Amino acid sequence: MIEVLTTDSQKLLHQLNTLLEQESRCQPKVCGLKLIESAHDNGLRMTARLRDFEVKDLLSLTQFFGFDTETFSLAVNLLDRFLSKMKVQAKHLGCVGLSCFYLAVKSIEEERNVPLATDLIRISQYRFTVSDLMRMEKIVLEKVCWKVKATTAFQFLQLYYSLIRETLPFERRNDLNFERLEAQLKACHCRIIFSKAKPSVLALAIIALEIQALKYVELTEGVECIQKHSKISGRDLTFWQELVSKCLTEYSSNKCSKPNGQKLKWIVSGRTARQLKHSYYRITHLPTIPETMG
C-alpha cells in the first residue's frame, strides 16, 4: 500500500499531492475544446484536424531540437488553453502554435539550448517575422493570464512511474519501460480529445493499459493504490483507457500520419547549420513505440 512505502516513495507521494492540488488550475476549457471538435472544416475556422496537425508539427520541432517531453507537453497545454478561449483563424494557427512552443522552451529548457527566434521561424518554414512571433507571444501570455507553468500529464506520468517502480524488486524495476510510456503520451497529445482528460487520469490510463499488457500482479496493485489516492473513479479510468488503446492502435497502423522531423532537414542551409549549435540540427526520427519486453 502507498501508506507504507519507503522514504523515497513518501517524497514522491508528497510531490503527487502537490500536483493533485494544482491540477485543476491552468487547464484548457473543455467547452472550448468541444466547440473546436464540432467545427466544420471550411478552411477558415479552427478544427480538431488542424489543431492535431499543428501539435504534430510541434512534436517534430521537439525532436529536431532534442527538447524534453516535458517541454512538448507544456507547449500542448498552452496551445489548447489558448485555442479553448479564443476564436483563432486557421491562417494564424502556425504563429500561435510556435509562440506556445517558444514559451514552453524558454520555461523548461536550459538557456543555452534555447534557439534564437529567427532560427526557430526559419527551421519551422513559416513566413511570419520575429516581430509577429513576439506580438503573438504577448497575446498568448495575456490570454493565459501570464501563467506559463502548468500541471501536465507528463509530470503525472513521471511520478506514477516512479511510485510504481519503487514497489518492485530491484531486479524487476526495468520491466516498465518509461521511454515507451513517453512515446504513448506523445501520441495521445496529438489528438485533441485527450486534452479534455484530467492530466492525472490520462497519465494513469496510459500506465494502467501498459501494465495490463505486462500481466504483472504487483504492478496492478500499485495502479489501484495510486488510483485510490488520486481519487480517480474506475469509470473514468476505464473510459480513458479505452480511448488510449484505440489511439495507440491507430497510431501503430499505416493509416495514421506521424510527425516527421525529416521535412525540417532541407531548410537548414550550411550557413545556418554553422550558426546553430550541433544539437539544433541533429535530426531524430520519431521512434515507433518500443515493444514490450516479455
From Swiss-Prot:
<dbReference type="GO" id="GO:0006949">
    <property type="term" value="P:syncytium formation"/>
</dbReference>
<keyword id="KW-0132">Cell division</keyword>
<keyword id="KW-0498">Mitosis</keyword>
<dbReference type="GO" id="GO:0030425">
    <property type="term" value="C:dendrite"/>
</dbReference>
<dbReference type="GO" id="GO:0000307">
    <property type="term" value="C:cyclin-dependent protein kinase holoenzyme complex"/>
</dbReference>
<dbReference type="GO" id="GO:0005737">
    <property type="term" value="C:cytoplasm"/>
</dbReference>
<dbReference type="GO" id="GO:0043025">
    <property type="term" value="C:neuronal cell body"/>
</dbReference>
<comment type="similarity">
    <text>Belongs to the cyclin family. Cyclin G subfamily.</text>
</comment>
<dbReference type="InterPro" id="IPR013763">
    <property type="entry name" value="Cyclin-like_dom"/>
</dbReference>
<dbReference type="GO" id="GO:0043066">
    <property type="term" value="P:negative regulation of apoptotic process"/>
</dbReference>
<keyword id="KW-0131">Cell cycle</keyword>
<dbReference type="InterPro" id="IPR036915">
    <property type="entry name" value="Cyclin-like_sf"/>
</dbReference>
<dbReference type="InterPro" id="IPR006671">
    <property type="entry name" value="Cyclin_N"/>
</dbReference>
<dbReference type="GO" id="GO:0007095">
    <property type="term" value="P:mitotic G2 DNA damage checkpoint signaling"/>
</dbReference>
<keyword id="KW-0195">Cyclin</keyword>
<protein>
    <recommendedName>
        <fullName>Cyclin-G1</fullName>
    </recommendedName>
</protein>
<dbReference type="Pfam" id="PF00134">
    <property type="entry name" value="Cyclin_N"/>
</dbReference>
<keyword id="KW-0539">Nucleus</keyword>
<dbReference type="GO" id="GO:0048471">
    <property type="term" value="C:perinuclear region of cytoplasm"/>
</dbReference>
<dbReference type="GO" id="GO:0016538">
    <property type="term" value="F:cyclin-dependent protein serine/threonine kinase regulator activity"/>
</dbReference>
<dbReference type="GO" id="GO:0000082">
    <property type="term" value="P:G1/S transition of mitotic cell cycle"/>
</dbReference>
<dbReference type="InterPro" id="IPR039361">
    <property type="entry name" value="Cyclin"/>
</dbReference>
<comment type="function">
    <text>May play a role in growth regulation. Is associated with G2/M phase arrest in response to DNA damage. May be an intermediate by which p53 mediates its role as an inhibitor of cellular proliferation.</text>
</comment>
<dbReference type="GO" id="GO:0005634">
    <property type="term" value="C:nucleus"/>
</dbReference>
<dbReference type="GO" id="GO:0009629">
    <property type="term" value="P:response to gravity"/>
</dbReference>
<dbReference type="GO" id="GO:0051301">
    <property type="term" value="P:cell division"/>
</dbReference>
